[in-house]
Amino acid sequence: MKQKVIVGLSGGVDSSVACYLLLEQGYEVEGLFMRNWDSATNNDILGNRNINDDICPQEQDYLDAKAVADKLNIKLYRVDFIKEYWDYVFSYFIEEYKKARTPNPDILCNKYIKFDKFLNYAINQLNADYIAMGHYAKVEFNKTTNQYELIKASDTNKDQTYFLSQLNQKQLSKTLFPLANLTKEQVRKIALKQNLITANKKDSTGICFIGERSFTNFLQNYIPNQTGDIVDIKTNKVLGQHIGVMYYTIGQRKGINLSGMSEPYYVADKDVKKNILYVCSTSDQSYLHSTSCLVNDINWILDISKYVDDINQFECQAKFRYRQIDNKVVVKKIDDNNYQVIFKKPLKAITIGQQAVFYLNDICLGGAVIDKVIK
């Protein structure tokens, strides 16, 4: 009897090809299109260029997913996780921004929606043996350690293990990543050869519910402007006005709106209580560097005692944003939920609220939220 796989069919080329490959491998395949955002329900008006369109981008994605399902002769279901997304992902996202932190909603979406609500729906409602996604990542079972390992994809430029760092053993045991050993170019070639409508569809970029528009406009739907001073962190001189410290991220250069300066300025720090945005000039970028950070809400994907000699202090690599190169670090345990991450060399623009994701070569060990940056 064939094993049944429910694919998260999003209307993009990656999930389309994932469906095709699984069919070729002999699985029983069905698609499930999920909708996590509703602009009307969520009062998403400001800057939303699609608000009056006859067909919103999400509905077009569904039509593309349906066309792929029809082409491959598989069933396609659809399900809404709009309330769940708001409760588990978006509420946290907004609360973090109100604190002038910079969260990563894609990581939370994977943890709570795609690999939890979606997974449970696929297994309990659609009788799936596995789910599959169009992510670029690998899952392998290590018989020596008796652990499912999340491993970097062959296409290192597209590798998405950073976004999957909050998953657990149960989730990995039920997940297939058919694109693990393919490059994006190879995926598009397969889609073209199979005449899939999504073959040349543009990749989605940025945060899914914002789309192609001003991030500031989007946030203004939920957080009111709070004007304050922009201050040179070195001289303490007021250089201008900002519209709210939550709209800026550490290391940001564009959009600070400081005119008449002799050189570019970067966001160096944020004081939420005083509502001050601190900036530094290009020649003073040392203010962007730090030597370590404190992290919490740690998630170890696997039993790290089977991978490191001393779980209280060990060396590994870490990424502090997507597509960043691996950085050598020492991870030092403070208690069960708090760790210090010491950098082998100073790093630039480490951002509170973002994820620190840990690797042992190509194996993703897990991730944690950056809570404090130590200069």
UniProtKB/Swiss-Prot annotation:
Superkingdom of origin: Bacteria
Q: Which UniProt keywords apply?
A: ATP-binding, Cytoplasm, Disulfide bond, Nucleotide-binding, RNA-binding, Transferase, tRNA processing, tRNA-binding
Quick one: which residues bind ATP? G8, L9, S10, G11, G12, V13, D14, S15, M34, G134
Q: Which organism is it from?
A: Mycoplasma mycoides subsp. mycoides SC (strain CCUG 32753 / NCTC 10114 / PG1)
Q: Where is this site: Interaction with tRNA?
A: H135, Q354
- Known EC number: 2.8.1.13
Biological role: Catalyzes the 2-thiolation of uridine at the wobble position (U34) of tRNA, leading to the formation of s(2)U34.
Q: Alphabetically, which GO biological process terms does the record hold?
A: tRNA wobble position uridine thiolation
Q: What class of enzyme is it?
A: transferase
One GO MF annotation is: ATP binding
Q: Where is this region: Interaction with tRNA?
A: 158-160, 321-322
Q: What's this protein's family per the entry?
A: Belongs to the MnmA/TRMU family.
Which gene produces this protein? mnmA
Q: Region Interaction with target base in tRNA: what ranges?
A: 104-106
Q: Which reaction does it catalyse?
A: S-sulfanyl-L-cysteinyl-[protein] + uridine(34) in tRNA + AH2 + ATP = 2-thiouridine(34) in tRNA + L-cysteinyl-[protein] + A + AMP + diphosphate + H(+)
Q: Which cysteines are joined by disulfide bonds?
A: C109-C208
Q: Which InterPro entries match?
A: MnmA-like, MnmA-like_C, MnmA-like_central, MnmA-like_central_sf, Rossmann-like_a/b/a_fold
The active site annotation covers C109 (nucleophile), C208 (cysteine persulfide intermediate)
What CDD domains does this protein map onto?
MnmA_TRMU-like
Localization terms from the record: Cytoplasm
Could you tell me what this protein is called? tRNA-specific 2-thiouridylase MnmA
State a GO cellular component annotated for this protein: cytoplasm
Cited NCBIfam families: PRK00143.1, trmU
**Primary location:** cytoplasm
SUPFAM superfamilies given in the database record: Adenine nucleotide alpha hydrolases-like
